[in-house]
Each structure stands twice: as structure tokens, then as C-alpha cells.
């Protein structure tokens, strides 16, 4: 038997039934986009025959899906009715089971009178406690669930109160036809019960919560608790918080509490030496850096004449210094050396000195 090489096998037929309608529409949109591209279709060997075939298959599958969905929509109310009936039958079965269990409890309680009295008391207490809670939470429950609970609760209580012998005789006679009639009647009156459950409460009438509290005077005796913010305000009024101090530069924390500004107003103004001492002490407190000692006297006040004389003297000294510096720079450029000039030399001087000595000796001899 001839077999194609690996990688050249024909593709397996696609199963369009497994894909959803959204996937089929997406594939159809892509294939139609390819068909609109004429340049791409011309380059294909089959001129887009396969693409057109897939488009036809996809359209047929989509139309078939739409027909099936339209038929299913016709039977949708019937299916909903069946579901409601199934739910009603299951609830009826549960009611029957509860009745049987209640019969067993009644039989056991008839054997033990002490236990029966205890059970009756406990049931009364639970019913009393469940009463106000049912009133408070009645508005939050859905109307449909409330209808079912209302319909089922009286039947359960009636069956519990009936003796076990009567219930055992009644259960076999309960036929399926009666259950179906009850289910159909409950389904027909479902909408009516929903409307009947809706109530509009007037503002003039007291609310259910108020009636529940009136039935229980113990709850009214309790004092209403104060809100938390009222407690905080009362506590703050008793113990006021002092206002925070404003931040000031170069002020120690010890001085902030003493309020130095008020103390200085009451005292007499201190002398200059005392102020200097305080300033030095303040600098020593806030920093370890200290000023260097002064080499000159502090600034003094001078008259206008003295200041003019000092300025002229300073200007003259400055000009002389500038002249010396200019002459020194000029001599360095011209390579001139300033030395003592003596054209006669040392001998002339010596001769004069000797001659002077001889003249002095001759004068002495005379």
C-alpha cells in the first residue's frame, strides 16, 4: 500500500460541531477577509476554492446552530415549568421526611414523660427566641423563599401535633395525583403570592423593630450608650491640652518653659557688660565655636577733619609705595644695577688721608 512521506499527510476533516457559535463566526469573518484580498487569491494555485468551500461550510453550520437555538427557545417555558415542579416535589418529599421524624420524636416522648416535658419547654423557648429575629430579618429575605417557608411551616406544625397513628394512616393514602394538583396550583399562584408579600409601610405606623422592643421591656430598660466622639469631647473639656510653643531659633528648651520675654519686661534693663556676658554665655550654650581675640581696638567715632587727614596720609603712602615698585620693575627690565660710584678709586682717598696726617704733624712742630 502506497503511503505519503511524513509531513505530507492530508489534513484531518474538521469537526465543526465541537466549536461554539462565537468561534464559528470568528472563523467565517477571517475567511471572508481573505476572500476580499484579490491579490492573495490570485497567487494561490486553486484561486481560493478551498477558502470558498470553508466559508460555505461555516455558513451552513452557523445557520444550523441558529435553527436549533430557535427551536430550543420555543420549549424554554416548558422546561422552566418542569424545573419548578421538580423543586416543588423535592420540597414535598422533605416535608414528608420531617413529618416522619417528628412522629418518631413524639413516640419516644410518650414513653418518657419527663423528657417530653423538657422537649416541650425547649421548643417553646426556641420558638420565642426565633420570633423577634424573624421579624427583624423578614425584610431582607427574598419573597419566593419566604413563600415556600410559609407554606411548608404550617404543614410541618400540623403534622407534628397530630398523633403518630393518624399520620401513619394518612401517609399511604397520600396519592401522587393530589401532589401534582398541589404543585400545579402553587405554580399558578406563584405570581399572586409574590404580589401579596409586598407591603408598603406608612411612616405613621410604628415599625416592626419598635413593636419587638415593646414586647420585651428588658431591652428598653437598658440605657443608650453614648457615642465615642461625645466621650472624647467631654474628656477634652475636662483636661484641655496646652497650645504648642512656636519654634524660635537660638532658644534653648529650658528657656522656652521659663518664658524669658515676660521676665525681661518686669526687670530693669541690664548694663552693657551684663548683656555682653549673657551673649557670650548664650553662644557657649548653643555652640562650641568661639570668636578669636581682637588684635586691634574696636571701632571709634572720628570727626570729619581727622578722617580727611588720615585718608590723605594713606593716599601719600600708597603713591610712594607704587613709585618704588614701578622703579624696581623698570630697573629689572633694563638690567640696571644701582651701586656706589667712586671714579678716583681707593688710592686717591688714601693719598688724601696721608697728606692730611703730614700736614697735621708739620703744624704740630711749628
From Swiss-Prot:
Residues 251-272 have a biased composition (Polar residues). One of its GO terms (cellular component) is RNA polymerase II, core complex. Dephosphorylated at Ser-268 by the PNUTS-PP1 complex, promoting RNA polymerase II transcription pause-release. InterPro entries: GRINL1, Tuftelin_GRINL1A/MYZAP/CCD68. It is found in: Nucleus. Residues 15-39, 299-333 form a coiled coil. Residues 1-23, 88-140, 158-182, 201-225, 237-280, 338-366 are annotated as: Disordered. Its main location: nucleus. Residues 29-68, 297-312 are annotated as: Important for transcription repressor activity. Keywords: Coiled coil, DNA-directed RNA polymerase, Nucleus, Phosphoprotein, Transcription. Residues 90-100, 347-358 have a biased composition (Basic and acidic residues). GO terms for molecular function: RNA polymerase II complex binding; transcription elongation factor activity. One of its GO terms (biological process) is maintenance of ER location. Residues 225-296, 313-338 are annotated as: Interaction with Pol II. Component of the Pol II(G) complex, which contains the RNA polymerase II (Pol II) core complex subunits and POLR2M isoform 1. Pol II(G) appears to be an abundant form of Pol II. Belongs to the GRINL1 family. Appears to be a stable component of the Pol II(G) complex form of RNA polymerase II (Pol II). Pol II synthesizes mRNA precursors and many functional non-coding RNAs and is the central component of the basal RNA polymerase II transcription machinery. May play a role in the Mediator complex-dependent regulation of transcription activation. Acts as a negative regulator of transcriptional activation; this repression is relieved by the Mediator complex, which restores Pol II(G) activator-dependent transcription to a level equivalent to that of Pol II. This is DNA-directed RNA polymerase II subunit GRINL1A. The gene is Polr2m.
Amino acid at each position: 500500500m502506497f503511503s505519503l512521506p511524513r509531513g505530507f499527510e492530508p489534513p484531518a476533516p474538521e469537526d465543526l460541531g465541537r466549536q461554539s457559535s462565537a468561534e464559528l463566526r470568528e472563523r467565517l469573518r477571517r475567511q471572508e477577509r481573505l476572500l476580499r484580498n484579490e491579490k492573495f487569491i490570485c497567487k494561490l494555485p486553486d484561486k481560493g476554492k478551498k477558502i470558498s468551500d470553508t466559508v460555505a461550510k461555516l455558513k451552513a453550520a452557523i445557520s444550523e446552530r441558529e435553527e436549533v437555538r430557535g427551536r430550543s427557545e420555543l420549549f424554554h417555558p416548558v422546561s422552566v415549568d418542569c424545573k419548578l415542579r421538580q423543586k416543588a416535589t423535592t420540597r414535598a418529599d422533605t416535608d414528608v421526611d420531617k413529618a416522619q421524624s417528628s412522629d418518631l420524636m413524639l413516640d419516644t416522648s410518650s414513653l418518657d414523660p419527663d423528657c417530653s416535658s423538657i422537649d416541650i419547654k425547649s421548643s417553646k423557648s426556641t420558638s420565642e427566641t426565633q420570633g423577634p429575629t424573624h421579624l427583624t430579618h423578614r425584610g431582607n429575605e427574598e419573597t419566593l423563599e419566604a413563600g415556600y417557608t410559609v407554606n411548608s411551616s404550617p404543614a410541618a406544625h400540623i403534622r407534628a401535633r397530630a398523633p403518630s397513628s393518624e399520620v401513619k394512616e394518612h401517609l399511604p393514602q397520600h396519592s401522587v395525583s393530589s401532589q401534582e394538583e398541589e404543585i400545579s396550583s402553587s405554580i399558578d399562584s406563584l405570581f399572586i403570592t409574590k404580589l401579596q408579600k409586598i407591603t408598603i409601610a406608612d411612616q405613621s405606623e410604628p415599625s416592626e423593630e419598635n413593636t419587638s422592643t415593646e414586647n420585651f421591656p428588658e431591652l428598653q430598660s437598658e440605657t443608650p450608650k453614648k457615642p465615642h466622639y461625645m466621650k472624647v469631647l467631654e474628656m477634652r473639656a475636662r483636661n484641655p491640652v496646652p497650645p504648642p510653643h512656636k519654634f524660635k531659633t537660638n532658644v534653648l528648651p529650658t528657656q522656652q518653659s521659663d518664658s524669658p520675654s515676660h521676665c525681661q519686661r518686669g526687670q530693669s534693663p541690664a548694663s552693657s557688660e551684663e548683656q555682653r556676658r549673657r551673649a557670650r554665655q548664650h553662644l557657649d550654650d548653643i555652640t562650641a565655636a568661639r570668636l578669636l581675640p581682637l588684635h586691634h581696638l574696636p571701632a571709634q567715632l572720628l570727626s570729619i577733619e581727622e578722617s580727611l587727614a588720615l585718608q590723605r596720609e594713606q593716599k601719600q603712602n600708597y603713591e610712594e609705595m607704587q613709585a618704588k615698585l614701578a622703579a624696581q620693575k623698570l630697573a629689572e627690565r633694563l638690567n640696571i644695577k644701582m651701586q656706589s660710584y667712586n671714579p678716583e678709586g681707593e688710592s686717591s682717598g688714601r693719598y688724601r688721608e696721608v697728606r692730611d696726617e703730614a700736614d697735621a704733624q708739620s703744624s704740630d712742630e711749628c
